[in-house]
């Protein structure tokens, strides 16, 4: 009886537990650690900041470079806390566009900017940023540039039909609240966006003084001043990741123009064995340390083609996380080469960061070319256009027939001498 009573009690208790579980929708699955529910919960691992997204490869927080095609090549975007080095083209025509795209993306996304230059006033640089294109305006503004170059789906290629299956580097635009935007380089960014944005300017001629002594730290005065300026902005404005602020988090976009040029007081572009060759590498080393512990991303343009010592270029590459080189066709033999008639230069992905990985995939970053259209700067996969003419084949047959007449009947011909050479 006792046993029966116990079983009955157990049955009733089990039934009541099941009923309670069904009433409260309780499952057997339990999350590890504290729950992320509730308005006051701060346990979310991923930081939610406007204009950013986590990488699908390594979970790193990414920002857009302002050029969606370049974001795709870099694995989704530029990782926060890293340095993007742009090797300037020979005449410095196309590299400033990537620099301006990066800054314009920061203004549209609501990020803070830090613009440093020894050549041009940062305020003037911001005035020359391209205007953003949002959804509907993209169709109106880019019909002439993009739609005219698209292949009709009903027209099939006669030669090299496999090109139809290649992925396209450019995609449609997105709304202002999403990741990455398109820009019209023929128009300037609205003045209202510049006035509402938060930016800091570093113009070297205004910051440097002749009495500044940096012999103890072995850095040029320009580099030392810039490092101090960046450090102050990171710590005072709350971009320090190791000491997070309670206010709303934001991203600091740092843009440094023409680093390593003589305008910065560096002579690595003048002589091969200069006394300050270590100054640039030490600057990059300290800069990376500041970026690693902060919510910031940096883009640097550098005239590497002017650096005399190739060993310095290798060190600069190793001290950068991502390296992209631009090779312009202006002034070279490729400018008149019919194979490159549809492009203005080549783009080389020298290095991709290994973030939370041992290796990185470089299979999709080869054979790339860029084209500057009327309103867009596009990156495309380099390919040769199909040759649909038969002029070459006909002329070669005529030349071959004439050569067989000169060779005579003893060189691979029959007695009649009417057949071509038999290989």
From Swiss-Prot:
<comment type="subunit">
    <text>Component of the elongator complex which consists of ELP1, ELP2, ELP3, ELP4, ELP5 and ELP6.</text>
</comment>
<dbReference type="GO" id="GO:0005737">
    <property type="term" value="C:cytoplasm"/>
</dbReference>
<comment type="similarity">
    <text>Belongs to the ELP4 family.</text>
</comment>
<comment type="function">
    <text>Component of the elongator complex which is required for multiple tRNA modifications, including mcm5U (5-methoxycarbonylmethyl uridine), mcm5s2U (5-methoxycarbonylmethyl-2-thiouridine), and ncm5U (5-carbamoylmethyl uridine). The elongator complex catalyzes the formation of carboxymethyluridine in the wobble base at position 34 in tRNAs.</text>
</comment>
<keyword id="KW-0819">tRNA processing</keyword>
<dbReference type="GO" id="GO:0008607">
    <property type="term" value="F:phosphorylase kinase regulator activity"/>
</dbReference>
<dbReference type="Pfam" id="PF05625">
    <property type="entry name" value="PAXNEB"/>
</dbReference>
<dbReference type="GO" id="GO:0006357">
    <property type="term" value="P:regulation of transcription by RNA polymerase II"/>
</dbReference>
<dbReference type="GO" id="GO:0008023">
    <property type="term" value="C:transcription elongation factor complex"/>
</dbReference>
<comment type="pathway">
    <text>tRNA modification; 5-methoxycarbonylmethyl-2-thiouridine-tRNA biosynthesis.</text>
</comment>
<keyword id="KW-0539">Nucleus</keyword>
<dbReference type="GO" id="GO:0002098">
    <property type="term" value="P:tRNA wobble uridine modification"/>
</dbReference>
<keyword id="KW-0963">Cytoplasm</keyword>
<dbReference type="InterPro" id="IPR008728">
    <property type="entry name" value="Elongator_complex_protein_4"/>
</dbReference>
<dbReference type="InterPro" id="IPR027417">
    <property type="entry name" value="P-loop_NTPase"/>
</dbReference>
<dbReference type="GO" id="GO:0033588">
    <property type="term" value="C:elongator holoenzyme complex"/>
</dbReference>
<protein>
    <recommendedName>
        <fullName>Elongator complex protein 4</fullName>
    </recommendedName>
</protein>
């Amino acid at each position: 009886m006792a046993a029966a009573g116990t079983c009955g009690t157990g049955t009733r208790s089990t039934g009541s537990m099941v009923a309670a579980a069904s009433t409260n929708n309780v499952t057997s699955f339990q999350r590890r650690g504290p729950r992320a529910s509730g308005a006051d919960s701060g346990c979310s691992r991923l930081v939610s900041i406007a204009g950013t997204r986590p990488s699908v490869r390594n979970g790193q927080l990414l920002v857009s470079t302002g050029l969606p095609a370049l974001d795709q090549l870099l694995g989704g975007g530029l990782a926060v806390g890293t340095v993007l080095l742009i090797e300037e083209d020979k005449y410095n025509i196309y590299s400033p566009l990537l620099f301006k795209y990066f800054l314009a993306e920061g203004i549209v996304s609501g990020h803070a900017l830090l613009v440093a230059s020894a050549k041009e006033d940062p305020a003037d640089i911001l005035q020359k940023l391209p205007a953003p294109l949002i959804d509907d305006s993209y169709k109106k503004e880019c019909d002439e540039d993009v739609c005219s170059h698209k292949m009709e789906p009903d027209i099939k290629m006669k030669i090299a039909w496999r090109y139809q299956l290649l992925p396209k580097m450019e995609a449609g635009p997105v709304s202002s609240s999403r990741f990455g935007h398109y820009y019209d380089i023929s128009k300037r960014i609205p003045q209202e966006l510049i006035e509402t944005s938060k930016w800091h300017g570093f113009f070297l001629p205004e910051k440097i003084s002749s009495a500044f002594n940096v012999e103890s730290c072995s850095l040029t005065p320009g580099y030392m001043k810039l490092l101090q300026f960046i450090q102050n902005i990171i710590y005072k404005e709350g971009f320090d990741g190791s000491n997070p602020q309670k206010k709303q988090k934001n991203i600091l976009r740092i843009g440094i123009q023409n680093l390593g040029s003589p305008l910065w007081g560096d002579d690595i572009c003048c002589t091969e064995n200069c006394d300050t060759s270590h100054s640039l590498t030490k600057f990059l080393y300290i800069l990376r340390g500041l970026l690693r512990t902060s919510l910031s991303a940096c883009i640097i343009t550098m005239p590497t083609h002017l650096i005399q010592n190739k060993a310095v270029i290798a060190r600069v590459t190793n001290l950068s996380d991502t390296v992209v080189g631009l090779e312009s066709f202006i002034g070279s033999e490729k400018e008149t080469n019919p194979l490159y008639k549809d492009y203005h230069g080549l783009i080389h992905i020298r290095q991709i960061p290994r973030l939370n990985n041992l290796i990185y995939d470089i299979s999709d970053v080869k054979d790339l070319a860029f084209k500057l259209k009327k309103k867009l700067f596009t990156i495309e996969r380099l390919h040769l256009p199909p040759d649909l003419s038969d002029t070459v084949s006909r002329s070669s047959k005529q030349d071959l027939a004439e050569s067989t007449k000169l060779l005579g009947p003893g060189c691979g011909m029959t007695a009649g001498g009417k057949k071509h050479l038999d290989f």
